[in-house]
């Protein structure tokens, strides 16, 4: 397929009005959440100047995902997802408003941030699987993978804009303003939910949830995953990426404050550059790799991320390098060359994320039976994000003891070694795995037709899952 054709295929879900409205609302809400995340990290830093405290807040916010996401996925497969999302979005808005009031009145203490992080994590654990499954309920089964990629684009737009806006809000108006903006942003999803009207094709997941068709257990979903080596890989890739990349975000306030000696606006700019790298890849590269056949690309993306993160470490943490950058930048008349160098490094490291996360998530969903989608989404959340509490805590304390640059370096080396071992010893990582997928009727489980390229047949499970919006089942094998 030509490049223009691939780009057109990529944006096909935008022709669905329901999905268009929901994507817009979700993007606004995500932007608000990232504004709050950046502002909250700065509040923690101002209160404590401690990497350990930053890691603890991040851990407490992520810990509920580990324990609750599997149950949340089962819940989202059994009840009306729209009603569940109404509740979670309004509660999250209330929590953001509470944080805004505490900061604005000067009453905020570290323990408040700990408690709010836990409660927000609990609600987010309930919200996530339903949000993912609901988005694909809107598109129908033929557009799942493209919808996942567009969701990723919306997230990257938010990631690029959100931290930068947070830096401006905190710098000019104070942290409380950022939290008020986040509280208001959840209303965008609520308004989108009010306007959504299902078509016959897009309502299958909702009908299954209301009728109890998604009545299997989490273990059914686990067995479905373990039965396909390629599907297992698509849970490993994002885990490795998030282990290496996302956990480093915990240390950025320390980098900016203690290493660069800059303020919240610089933090927003540097984190925003990470988002800009994500966004550039989402718009320019993702459409071209929709049909890539070898998952080694994902491992390569992780290795590229590691190289960029090393560049970030050397550019920011080594005094001789910083002095050289400042001298070179001054001779060229560049504004704040050290921050600019950090932005270049974070842009390059951020550029790998959409490839890893979008391809893995899209293929997880394509390999999911329709009535199990939310459970497979929840398992992905548990594996990828549920482990973050421990990683965040470990990275935070490593930064506290050895310094933030050393913590980032150790994390990058660890991830790279794991990726190399995976590529070396797991044959399915190097094999062709993305083949034309055949549609199966969820109500008529049976063997999928042979793929046009001669792909193997894969029997569809008798219990059809329900994740993000349709029911294509992959014929990929190890």
Sequence positions of predicted segments:
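C-terminal transmembrane bundle of multi-pass solute transporters/carriers
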Residues: 57, 67, 71, 84, ...
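Juxtamembrane intracellular "pre-TM" segments in multi-pass secondary transporters
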Residues: 2-19, 199-236, 259, 441-450
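Helix-loop boundary and gating motifs at the non-cytosolic
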Residues: 3-64, 229-274
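Transmembrane alpha-helix termini and helix-breaking/packing motifs in multi-pass membrane transporters
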Residues: 41-47, 100-105, 161-181, 258-259, ...
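Membrane-helix interface/capping residues of multi-pass secondary transporters
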Residues: 19, 51, 81, 110, ...
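Small-residue-rich packing faces within the transmembrane alpha-helices of Major Facilitator Superfamily
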Residues: 62, 93-100, 156, 183, ...
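Helix-loop junctions on the cytosolic side of multi-pass membrane transporters
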Residues: 106, 133, 137, 179-209, ...
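Substrate-agnostic recognition of the 12-TM MFS/MFS-like secondary transporter fold
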Residues: 20-37, 61-74, 80-95, 112-171, ...
């Amino acid at each position: 397929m030509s490049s223009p054709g691939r780009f057109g295929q990529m944006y096909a879900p935008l022709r669905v009005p329901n999905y268009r409205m929901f994507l817009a609302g979700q993007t606004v809400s995500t932007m608000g959440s990232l504004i709050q995340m950046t502002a909250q990290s700065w509040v923690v830093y101002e209160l404590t100047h401690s990497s350990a405290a930053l890691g603890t807040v991040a851990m407490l916010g992520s810990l509920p995902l580990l324990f609750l996401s599997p149950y949340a996925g089962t819940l989202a497969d059994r009840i009306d997802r729209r009603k569940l999302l109404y509740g979670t979005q309004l509660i999250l808005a209330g929590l953001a408003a509470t944080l805004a009031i505490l900061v604005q009145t000067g009453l905020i203490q570290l323990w408040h941030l700990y408690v709010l992080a836990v409660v927000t994590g609990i609600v987010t654990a309930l919200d996530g699987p339903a949000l993912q499954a609901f988005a694909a309920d809107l598109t129908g089964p033929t557009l799942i993978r493209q919808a996942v990629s567009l969701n990723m684009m919306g997230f990257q737009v938010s990631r690029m804009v959100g931290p930068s806006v947070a830096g401006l809000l905190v710098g000019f108006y104070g942290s409380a303003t950022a939290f008020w903006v986040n509280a208001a942003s959840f209303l965008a999803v609520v308004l989108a939910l009010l306007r959504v009207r299902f078509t016959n094709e897009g309502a299958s997941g909702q009908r299954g949830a209301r009728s109890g068709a998604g009545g299997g257990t989490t273990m059914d979903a686990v067995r479905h995953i373990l039965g396909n080596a390629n599907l297992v890989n698509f849970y490993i890739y994002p885990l490795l990426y998030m282990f290496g990349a996302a956990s480093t975000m915990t240390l950025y306030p320390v980098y900016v404050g203690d290493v660069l000696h800059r303020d919240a606006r610089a933090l927003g700019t540097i984190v925003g550059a990470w988002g800009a790298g994500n966004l550039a890849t989402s718009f320019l590269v993702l459409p071209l790799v929709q049909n890539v056949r070898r998952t080694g690309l994902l491992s390569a993306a992780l290795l590229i991320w590691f190289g960029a993160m090393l560049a970030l470490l050397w550019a920011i943490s080594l005094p001789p390098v910083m002095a050289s950058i400042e001298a070179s930048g001054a001779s060229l008349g560049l504004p704040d060359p050290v921050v600019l160098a950090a932005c270049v490094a974070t842009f390059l490291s951020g550029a790998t994320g959409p490839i890893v996360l979008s391809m893995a998530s899209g293929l997880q969903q394509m390999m999911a039976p329709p009535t199990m989608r939310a459970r497979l989404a929840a398992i992905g959340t548990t594996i990828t994000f549920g482990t973050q509490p421990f990683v965040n805590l470990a990275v935070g304390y490593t930064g506290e003891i050895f310094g933030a640059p050393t913590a980032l370096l150790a994390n990058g080396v660890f991830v790279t070694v794991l990726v190399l071992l995976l590529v070396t010893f797991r044959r399915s990582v190097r094999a062709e795995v993305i083949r034309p997928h055949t549609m199966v009727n969820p109500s008529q489980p049976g063997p999928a037709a042979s793929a046009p390229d001669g792909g193997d047949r894969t029997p569809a499970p008798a219990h059809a899952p329900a994740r993000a919006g349709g029911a294509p089942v992959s014929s990929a094998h190890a």
